[in-house]
C-alpha cells in the first residue's frame, strides 16, 4: 500500500485551489478597473490575496500540524506525543506505537488495531525529521531506513 491515491487527491485539491485563486485574481483586477481604482489599491488587493494563498498552502497537504512541519526533529526513539498519531499511522510496527504488558500489546494510537502477542512484527524504531524529509530507522528490518516526504507520507512495507 503506497501513498499513490493520497498524492493524486492532493494534486486535485491543489489544482482546484489554483483555479479558484486565478478566478479571484482576475475578478479582483476587473473590479478594480471597473471602479477606476488606482493602481496602488489594486496592488494592495493582489498582495492581500497572495498572503491568503500562502497561508492556505499548509492546509492543503500537511498531515502534521502547520506549527511543526518545518521544525527539525533530532533522531529519537520516542516521538513527541502530539506527533505520535502521525508516526504510528505510517510505521504501525514501531515499538513506540505499542503498549506491551505480559506479552500482549495494544496499539497506543490506532483503536482499530487488534491486540497482538509481542512478536517480530514490533520493531525497534527511531525517527527523525529535517525540514520536509521524514525518516524511520528500523531495527533489524531491511531496508533499514524508510525515507518519505513529510507532507506526502508513505507506508513502510
From Swiss-Prot:
Q: Name one Pfam family in it.
A: v110
Record keyword Protein biosynthesis present: no
Q: How does it sit in the membrane?
A: Multi-pass membrane protein
Say if the entry is tagged with keyword Transmembrane: yes
Q: Which GO terms describe its cellular component?
A: host cell membrane; membrane
Q: Specify the superkingdom.
A: Viruses
TM spans (from-to): 14-34, 39-59
Q: Could you tell me where this protein is found in the cell? A: Host membrane
Provide the primary localization.
host cell
| Keyword terms, alphabetized | Host membrane, Membrane, Transmembrane, Transmembrane helix
InterPro entries referenced in this protein's UniProt entry, alphabetically: ASFV_fam_110
Please give the function described in this protein's UniProt entry: Plays a role in virus cell tropism, and may be required for efficient virus replication in macrophages.
Into which family does the record put it? Belongs to the asfivirus MGF 110 family.
Protein name from the UniProt record: Protein MGF 110-13L
Which organism is this protein's natural source?
African swine fever virus (isolate Tick/Malawi/Lil 20-1/1983) (ASFV)
